[in-house]
A protein has these predicted regions:
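Bacterial N-terminal signal peptides that target proteins for export
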Residues: 3-22
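Polar/charged alpha-helical tracts
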Residues: 13, 35-37
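N-terminal signal peptide c-region/cleavage motif recognized by signal peptidases
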Residues: 31-33
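Acidic, serine/threonine-rich low-complexity disordered tracts
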Residues: 38-143, 182-273
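Acidic/charged, solvent-exposed loop-and-adjacent secondary-structure segments enriched in E/D, K/R, S/T
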Residues: 143-171
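Anionic-ligand-binding alpha/beta catalytic cores of soluble enzymes and soluble regulatory domains
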Residues: 171-172, 178
């Protein structure tokens, strides 16, 4: 069954409209140096004390899921409501994921990732980012390159590098496989590709919280996201992963511009696609 659109998005400054546009859950809108210019590992885990974890990454695929969300947002302090959906479809040694959210005035933004599943997690083959135009990143493992449709120079492909869609399922699968390895204060840094560059995304584990959501009451592990970019305009974002749903996201919250721009996604339903 082909995947329908879904969501992880929300916040890129659009030069033509000046609007905070839906783009990908905890955007790493970094202008940082490309992966070809760094020796950073594609996935790095550090303890709360800053020590690098030595154990190899363990990963467990979440079951196929369709997650529907209610969305409450603000743009320049003006409130709006909409809906969103995340689809995740593993099939044998392959996976497909897609996301989309409708934003008033702006329209829709769709992101998708397709690739294979390895013993340590996801191996993306292509990432597509579609709004007014379609852009992509192609992971060419044989040539050892990641290619960008927007004209950026190719960068080195390193096994374990993710894209802006797959990165969330990579994190979910890592925690699901070995939750004891990720106590409060743990930092997970993953190199993730957009349609123009590769940049590090860092998730910090903040602990378990009880959430009251449209789908009901549930326990979830809170992670906060940060990047090395200064272009996010005071972007603050958080992600809640539910152990009862194999650590899939049940809440996503983003704020920028002192809270004048805001997005809060809360799980409404969880079904099989």
């Amino acid at each position: 069954m082909p995947l329908r659109p879904s969501v992880f998005t929300i916040a890129q400054r659009n030069a033509k409209t000046g609007l905070s546009l839906a783009l990908g859950l905890l955007l790493g809108m970094s202008a940082a140096a490309s992966y070809a210019q760094t020796t950073t590992a594609p996935i790095e885990v550090r303890t709360a004390q800053g020590q690098r974890a030595k154990a190899p990454v363990a990963w467990r695929a979440p079951d196929a899921a369709r997650l529907q969300f209610t969305v409450q947002g603000k743009y320049k302090s003006m409130p709006y409501q909409t809906k969103a959906q995340i689809d995740w479809l593993p099939q044998g040694q392959r996976y497909e994921a897609a996301q989309e959210v409708q934003i008033p005035i702006v329209g829709s933004r769709r992101q998708s990732s397709v690739g294979t599943i390895g013993p340590n997690g996801l191996l993306p083959e292509i990432f597509i980012d579609r709004a007014r135009k379609e852009n992509s990143a192609t992971f060419d493992a044989k040539a050892g390159q990641i290619l960008f449709s927007r004209g950026s120079e190719p960068v080195a492909w390193v096994r374990g590098t993710q894209d802006r869609m797959s990165v969330f399922f990579q994190v979910a699968g890592m925690i699901a496989a070995a939750p004891q390895r990720y106590p409060q204060g743990t930092k997970i840094t993953i190199q993730a590709a957009s349609s123009s560059r590769v940049a590090p995304w860092t998730f910090t584990v903040r602990g378990t919280e009880n959430l009251q959501l449209p789908a009901g009451r549930m326990q979830a592990l809170k992670l906060e996201h940060s990047s090395d970019s200064s272009a996010e305009d005071n972007l603050q974002s958080a992600l809640w992963l539910a152990p009862g749903l194999q650590y899939l996201p049940v809440r996503i919250r983003m704020q920028e511009d002192g809270g004048r721009d805001e997005l809060d996604l809360k799980l409404q339903s969880h079904t099989k696609p």
